[in-house]
Amino acid sequence: MAGNFDSEERSSWYWGRLSRQEAVALLQGQRHGVFLVRDSSTSPGDYVLSVSENSRVSHYIINSSGPRPPVPPSPAQPPPGVSPSRLRIGDQEFDSLPALLEFYKIHYLDTTTLIEPVSRSRQGSGVILRQEEAEYVRALFDFNGNDEEDLPFKKGDILRIRDKPEEQWWNAEDSEGKRGMIPVPYVEKYRPASASVSALIGGNQEGSHPQPLGGPEPGPYAQPSVNTPLPNLQNGPIYARVIQKRVPNAYDKTALALEVGELVKVTKINVSGQWEGECNGKRGHFPFTHVRLLDQQNPEEDFS
């Protein structure tokens, strides 16, 4: 299902000058396909498409050739002798940002299409914290997690606290950027001895240290996949191969358990990212990030 946003409504998705760290803070923990467009801080005139996908935040550079177009571009024709600007992302070229966003409504970047812009209400919610304001804990015991909302960790791991919704359960983030709920009795408060420890957690997903807010753009950019369209169930059955094991909550009878390598018949594609399907004679819902769609033109090549 295509994204539910108006690509011509600039104010909903364009954030102007925003650092990578600020973009991560806005998008981390959002559902797959939530995105924003910002100015590149290292390449003036270019843009960056930042997207929440596969439990991380990916950043795709959008290179602009020729005069930088307005956002969205004016319908006026360029002066004689001036070539119109072109926008390139990966191997794709577009005349405007709205055209680019429309394309990725129905084509995958890596593991998701564009679903909706991040809400601007998060800008004033205190979600962006400077490192000195962050709170950390150290694990006293191993914790394997009991359900999908939990964040597993090992004894000695350093975690960054993001929120405290309950007295005994806090929301935390590990050094890989994964987030989830942790049991408070399993951890102790921890104060980093140096900035290098705090920089390790809560930074960008490419492994380089986060920069000060509004600072340079660290780390490499992701590359979009080549022309992978969102499948259309009206064209016939769609199959996918499980790439990540899933053990659903025992109390959720509508969730589908998955084992790596199993074949899933997709029966419904929801914009939320929770798809529905059949596997081993059982029907239920599952996160689409746990499967890889097979080549619908030659599915038999993947069935073996």
Swiss-Prot record:
The modification Phosphotyrosine is found at Y108, Y221, Y239. GO terms for cellular component: actin cytoskeleton; cytoplasm; cytosol; membrane; neuromuscular junction; plasma membrane; protein-containing complex. Changing Y221F: No activation of Rac signaling. It comes from the Eukaryota. Phosphorylated on Tyr-221 upon cell adhesion. Results in the negative regulation of the association with SH2- and SH3-binding partners, possibly by the formation of an intramolecular interaction of phosphorylated Tyr-221 with the SH2 domain. This leads finally to the down-regulation of the Crk signaling pathway. Isoform Crk-II: Phosphorylated by KIT. Residues 13-118 form the SH2 domain. GO terms for biological process: actin cytoskeleton organization; cell chemotaxis; cell migration; cell population proliferation; cellular response to endothelin; cellular response to insulin-like growth factor stimulus; cellular response to nerve growth factor stimulus; cellular response to nitric oxide. SMART domains: SH2, SH3. The C-terminal SH3 domain function as a negative modulator for transformation and the N-terminal SH3 domain appears to function as a positive regulator for transformation. The SH2 domain mediates interaction with tyrosine phosphorylated proteins. Mediates interaction with SHB. Belongs to the CRK family. This is Adapter molecule crk. The gene is Crk.
